């Protein structure tokens, strides 16, 4: 897997841990081993501009996902598709506030947002209650497995 992480946020980021988490999630979701992922950490003005440009929402957000080849999780009895999974844009400053509010800190929030973003890249959504249950359940399961290893 090719995982590129760019930190343009001005916030310290454990790039190796983030890459390992991404690889873990992609492996668990049976993403093709040659799939590509780019994660960019940016500041609040940058993510606010992207949020407005692409989501038509004002202000900063925590994570944006830009799927490329519309890859989906692999099935047990099928070979996964090769391609570019997509790009994630994270905002560590927003993550820091959310992590503090949630009581689990910045690093745990960045991990959560990374898993959340990868699931979006794989086609998961949470607009409807059933989708929400499925996506957040899977997100919790992946994070628990990551932290238990």
Swiss-Prot record:
Entry's Gene Ontology BP terms: rRNA processing
Annotated positions binding Zn(2+): 116, 120, 126
Enzyme class: hydrolase
GO cellular component: cytoplasm
Principal subcellular localization: cytoplasm
Gene3D superfamilies xrefs: Metalloproteases ('zincins'), catalytic domain
UniProt cross-references to PROSITE patterns, sorted A to Z: UPF0054 (PS01306)
SUPFAM superfamilies named among the record's database cross-references: Metalloproteases ('zincins'), catalytic domain (SSF55486)
UniProt cofactor(s): Zn(2+)
Cofactor comment: Binds 1 zinc ion.
Keywords carried by this UniProt record: Cytoplasm, Endonuclease, Hydrolase, Metal-binding, Nuclease, Ribosome biogenesis, rRNA processing, Zinc
GO MF annotations, alphabetized: metalloendopeptidase activity; RNA endonuclease activity; zinc ion binding
Enzyme Commission designation: 3.1.-.-
Pfam annotation, one family: YbeY
Record-linked InterPro entries: MetalPrtase_cat_dom_sf_prd, YbeY, YbeY_CS
Compartments in which it is found: Cytoplasm
Function: Single strand-specific metallo-endoribonuclease involved in late-stage 70S ribosome quality control and in maturation of the 3' terminus of the 16S rRNA.
Family: Belongs to the endoribonuclease YbeY family.
HAMAP family attached to this UniProt entry: Endoribonucl_YbeY
PANTHER family per UniProt: ENDORIBONUCLEASE YBEY, CHLOROPLASTIC
Name listed for the protein in its UniProt record: Endoribonuclease YbeY
């Amino acid at each position: 897997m090719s995982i590129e992480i760019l930190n343009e946020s001005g916030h310290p980021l454990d790039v190796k841990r983030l890459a390992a988490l991404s690889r873990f999630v992609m492996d668990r979701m049976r993403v093709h081993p040659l799939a590509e992922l780019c994660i960019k950490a940016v500041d609040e003005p940058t993510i606010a501009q992207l949020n407005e440009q692409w989501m038509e929402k004002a202000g900063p957000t925590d994570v944006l996902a830009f799927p490329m080849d519309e890859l989906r999780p692999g099935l047990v009895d099928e070979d996964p598709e090769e391609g570019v999974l997509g790009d994630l844009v994270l905002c560590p400053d927003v993550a820091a506030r959310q992590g503090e509010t949630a009581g689990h800190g910045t690093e745990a929030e960045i991990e959560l947002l990374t898993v959340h973003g990868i699931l979006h890249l794989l086609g998961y959504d949470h607009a409807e209650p059933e989708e929400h249950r499925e996506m957040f359940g899977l997100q919790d399961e992946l994070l628990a497995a990551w932290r238990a290893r």
